Amino acid sequence: MTAVVNGNSKRYSWWWDSHISPKNSKWLQENLTDMDSKVKQMIKVIEEDADSFARRAEMYYKKRPELMKLVEEFYRAYRALAERYDHATGVIRHAQQTMAEAFPNQDPMMFGEESPLGSSTDGFDPQTPDSYPPIRAPVYPDDLRKGAFGISSSHLSTVKRNIAFMEDPQSVSSGKGFKTAKARKGLNFNNVDGKEINAKVLSESERASKAEAEIVALKDALSKVQAEKEASLAQFDQNLEKLSNLESEVSRAQEDSRVLIERATRAEAEVETLRESLSKVEVEKESSLLQYQQCLQNIADLEDRISLAQKEAGEVDERANRAEAETLALKQSLVSSETDKEAALVQYQQCLKTISNLEERLHKAEEDSRLTNQRAENAEGEVESLKQKVSKLIEENEAYELQYQQCLDTIADLKLKLFHAQEETQRLSREIEDGVAKLKFAEEKCVVLERSNQNLHSELDGLLEKLGNQSHELTEKQKELGRLWTCVQEENLRFMEAETAFQTLQQLHSQSQEELSTLALELQNRSQILKDMEARNNGLQEEVQEAKDQSKSLNELNLSSAASIKSLQEEVSKLRETIQKLEAEVELRVDQRNALQQEIYCLKEELSQIGKKHQSMVEQVELVGLHPESFGSSVKELQEENSKLKEIRERESIEKTALIEKLEMMEKLVQKNLLLENSISDLNAELETIRGKLKTLEEASMSLAEEKSGLHSEKDMLISRLQSATENSKKLSEENMVLENSLFNANVELEELKSKLKSLEESCHLLNDDKTTLTSERESLLSHIDTMRKRIEDLEKEHAELKVKVLELATERESSLQKIEELGVSLNAKDCEYASFVQFSESRMNGMESTIHHLQDENQCRVREYQVELDRAHDAHIEIIVLQKCLQDWLEKSSSLIAENQDIKEASKLLEKLVSELEEENIGKQVQIDSSINCIKILRTGIYQVLMKLEIIPGIGSGDENSRDQRNMHDILNRLEDMQTMLLSIRDENQHSAIENLVLIEFLRQLKSEAVGIETEKKILEEELESQCQQLSFSRDETQKLIFVNGELTTKVNQGVNREKVLMVEIEDFHRQVLQLRDDYTILQGDNNKTLDEKAYLTKSTLQLEEEKCKLEDDISLLLSETIYQSNLIILLEDVILEKLSGAMKLNEDLDRLSIVKCKLEEEVRELGDKLKSADIANFQLQVVLEKSNAELLSARSANVHLEHEIANVKVQKEKELLEAMLMISIMQNEKSELSKAVEGLECRYKEAKAIEEDRDKQVLRLRGDYDEQVKKNSHSNEANLKLEADLMNLLMELEEIKVEKENLNQELFTERNEIELWESQSATLFGELQISAVHETLLEGLTNELVEACKNLESRSTLKDREIEQLKGRVNNLEDANKGQNDLMCKYAQAIFLLKESIQSLEKHAMLHEFENGPATETASLVDNSDGFLEIQELHLRIKAIEEAITKKLAMEELKTSSARRSRRRNGSLRKQNHEIYSEETEMITKDIVLDQVSDCSSYGISTRDILKIEDDHSLEAKSQNPPKGKSLSEESLVVDKLEISDRFTDPNKDANKRKVLERLNSDLQKLSNLHVAVEDLKIKVETEEKDEKGKENEYETIKGQINEAEEALEKLLSINRKLVTKVQNGFERSDGSKSSMDLDENESSRRRRISEQARRGSEKIGRLQLEIQRLQFLLLKLEGDREDRAKAKISDSKTRILLRDYIYSGVRGERRKRIKKRFAFCGCVQPPPSP
């Protein structure tokens, strides 16, 4: 039973996994992934944030439908999961019931919460269903038949039904067929009845499960919706409470402000009563006392107002804090909603866990099948009712969400109101400061009056006492105010700042009193001076009275204008928002300008790097024909111009700041004018006259606004022209880039040809070495002389063919150089044309500058008039200043770019001259080579004479002259040796015949081994010759291809030249216009002294530029400067446009304020009720109009955004179309026509502007007359006001009470009036803005396209310029390499002469033996260091003659000395030893030559040949030190091939040869590693520089850096390994020399040598891999330089990789060849020594 119980623990896990596990159910997996994605989208939408609450509300309303959609989809997915879960649980319950009936003896498995313990009897965890064994594992048919469990047949039928019910066909087919087949086999007693019952049970269970799943899902949905409803209701209630709290707080704050205002009015009344009492006491002293009282009154009023303003500011701060707290609460609510969602996800996971727990309870499923029909029907009804409820709840939820949104709207409105209140407080504080300034001015006048009073000296003391009493009274009142302040401080701690301000005012008052006392003392001392001032006293008293009147009117206006200030502040806030939007657009433009400036900065850095090389090229500049002194002076002059222009720019910035301060003063004056108009409006008689004047002013302002719009349009046209000019310059730069690319390709081709020439030269050297080895072998092997001669002749023919090919390549190189020179001539012609163009453009720019200066003077005059009259014409002056800055920036940048361009040109010229100088050096070296050839001819004649003396017939063959010389020398040596051998044979025939036979046998063995080695080497040589022939054919094909490409490039260059000519003709028209503007600018400069100096400097610069026509100024510099200037001008003009718009808005605001003041005064006196009705109607109409205007503005802004996106897309597309120059030509033509049209339009607009300015002047004169009339009327009214002061005081008291009553009404009307005023002001501004925006859109569309194209042209030009510079550098490097190659050839010729000299010395030793016996051999000096090589060759010729004489003497002596055979034999043995020593020295020199040949392969890696020579010298010295003292003959060394046939005495040469080979390999590896180290350092520098320039590709450069560091580490490891191997080889071979006797030690040494050679071979392979890796990194760097340079850089990278791979591929072959060559040590460059007998 335990087995059955264990099987029950997870009996239906297979079915449960198919319904629940996401791995087995694709539907579940997709549903879960969909839910996850929806949740992430919802979180993303909720997490979005904004700067302000209003923005957040807008975002919420925009994202609300998206959120609703996501929530609905999430709910649907969750509902589907719930239905699936309910279906599964229902099936499980039915299965549990049927199993309980089938197996009553078993313990029933509890389902859901029915299990008290929650675990099965077998100890398995119910929460881990996957860990149980399969359900049907223990159920087998044999067990069932045996009745092991005691189950009856009825029970078995029920079991069979249960199993049939549980066996889904899908599960059977899913991999459990074996066990299910067993179960069916054991339980299939009644198949037919079981199947029918199972089908019914399945259908009924499915219906019931579906219905129950729907019920459960709907219940869950209802519970969730209700929970959400409750949460939303709670949030709604909270928000309502917060709103009510805010409203109550606002009302409290308003009440507090009212109470404070009432207290302030009471305090003012008390101050006025005090003033009246003081006036009664001081009737006798009316003038001075009245003035002082008024000052005190003004101070008190201002203090009260300051306190009120500070209180209001504190209240506003409190409101702002509360609003911020509300926003935080809302954020917290959002966070809580997110946590609720997370909790829902957690609950879902818990549901999944409970689903896994319910797997164990699958035994009660059959009983529920009977009741499924009834439940299904009931469930369907419940489902329908629940669906209706759910829909209702969803609707209620939506309604609550709408209410929540309304609450958010109200909160946003309250925040806006708080913001407006803050602005009002700031405005009031500013007005109070203005009042304080006026009071100070009045106090100064009072001081002057007190000085003028002579008779009041004695009375001043009494007045001071009275003033003290008054100050005591004021201090008492101030104490009362202090008490009030303490009350306010208890309410809000922020009013402390107001108290400190009040105390500072008191201190100022006390200071003024002290100053009065000091002034009184001064009056006593200066009484005589004041007598003369009595006449002026009366006038000053009148002025003081006027100031009193003004102060009173200002006090009244401060109270009455509070409401108007609030409305104006609201307008100002809206205008500020519009200004912020415009500033954002301006920032975008500024970013574009900064991007262009960064690109220009990059170009400047590159040009500065080129300029660093200028110092080294000054001497070469003199060779070219340029004068460096004049060039430096011109550069200095341009720098001085640049500095002066910078100073001008700084001055203009200072002027701009001054103008901004003037603008602020203008705003203050405008406010003062408004206050004055309000004071004048109190007089009913003067109101009508002022209304007429206001109408005229409104008309004038409208005309001014129209004029400004016209000026804006004119500026836009100017901007379009400037942009077209930038595009022209960019097109020219692109064409120059094409030319530079062509030059660069030509240089690359030349480099390839040079590299091929080097390879061919190396191959020639190798062939020469092969020839020498073959001749030496011919001497040793007399039997193979004929065959070897034939092969040598073939090799000589091939060598001649190679020379012919080399000459052909040289002619091709000369033709390519001629083509390059032709291109340089064409560029010079272009530069000449450009010089004329520069002069023309400068004259035109002078005209533009003169016109601009003229306009500046006119605008300055107007500004002065308006400052005196109305101070409203400052915008024109600002525009002129902006234009001056633009021009100055343009001049600075143009001068800097001209200087840079000149530097580049001079560098290019210097490089070309360097090329020519290098060619001349090559020619000189060729002459030296010819002289050396002549010397060799002289030596040949001497050798021929020696042959004739020796009676040797010279060889007449078809080979080369070098081979003939070698043959002749060999014949001479052979003849001499034959003579010696003949003598020895005659002397020793009888005595040593046996010894000679043994020697001959050994010699024959050696000859056999040598013959075998020679045959193998011949085969290898034949294969190498074939490979070289293939390489030559490949190089021919490449040269033909390069010639074809060069022809195509020349055609392209010619086409570019023609295009440039056409563009130059088109550009000349544009520069004429620029010259006209410059003339106008010079006219304006004549007005000012500073501008006169600048004009003189500019004229000097223009004259210098005209003198420098022949110095080839480049087209691109001016065009680049013009484009940069125009881009800056566009940005500055846009700033000017924005400032103009702001000025127009300010004018409209001024007019609106005047109209508002009129309407308010009329409404307060006459028609309050009628105004409310009309305000409602007008408000509705204006709302409609404003909605339309807002819609239009939104559409315009969206259009602008769309245009910006289109501009970005166009940029991306245009970058791919840089090389389409034909399209650019057509665009240039269109731009030319547009520029001409724009110039005409500008001229017409300029005339219109002049007419408008004349009308404006007339209007100014009219206003001046009106103003004079007003002044007169004001003087009369002021006299009347003096009489009516007492009456006005009483009336003011009554008016204050009336105003208190009216304020309640005004507060209700404020909101509506503010809205009406806002609509009126905004409608007027918006309609104007719409018209302007329509014009701007049309202009900006064209301008943006033109700017994009211009920017691309500039970039392409800059890249082409860089390429040209790089090409010239490469060209110079190639010529330097060629020069070095010629130097190497000369060194080799010198070495050949040196070897000839040594061979002659050996001849002398053979010929004149007695001289060598008498004294040691003197060492000969090398010809490498001797400058006069011809004399050395003559000396050699004389020595050859001496050898002839010596030989003749020797023959005569031999005939006489036949008797002394043994003695001569010993002498000959000593001579042989000397020959061996000489031979060893010669082999060392030959290895040195071979190492030099080997090093020449490394030239492609960037190491100079001088350094390589130094390295090889060091290696040669080491090799000399390491060689054993005893030399080896060639025959001994050639025996290394077959070790078995070599005797013990030839082991030492084999070891030395192995050692030499290993050392040569290690030395070559070391050289390669040093070259790779230099390449890695260059890559590091290049990566760092390019990473600084390109900031968008840091990741790619970091990866490359990492790879470079890895390569560097590998290099260091290989270097250390190489050093260790070198030390091992040296130490190991030295040890081997001492252990020759024992064979065991020899075997160990040979194994160790093999290991060392194997390690060396592996090291060379690793070095090869490292070379490929570094080449790959170089290719990556070339690839990262940009998409624009893909073609050119692809060619560069291909050429570089070809060269480097070729060197790498053939390096091994050449190294092996050199090793084989080094085996055969040549006696000299052309002679092989004889083998030792």
Swiss-Prot record:
Pfam families: KIP1. GO terms for molecular function: actin binding. Residues 12-92 form the NAB domain. Residues 1456-1476, 1628-1656 are annotated as: Disordered. SUPFAM superfamilies: Tropomyosin. Gene3D superfamilies: 1.10.287.1490. GO terms for cellular component: membrane. Keywords: Coiled coil. Transmembrane segments: none annotated. Residues 1460-1470 have a biased composition (Basic residues). It comes from the Eukaryota. PANTHER family: PROTEIN NETWORKED 1D, PROTEIN NETWORKED 4A. Plant-specific actin binding protein. May be part of a membrane-cytoskeletal adapter complex. This is Protein NETWORKED 1D. It comes from Arabidopsis thaliana.
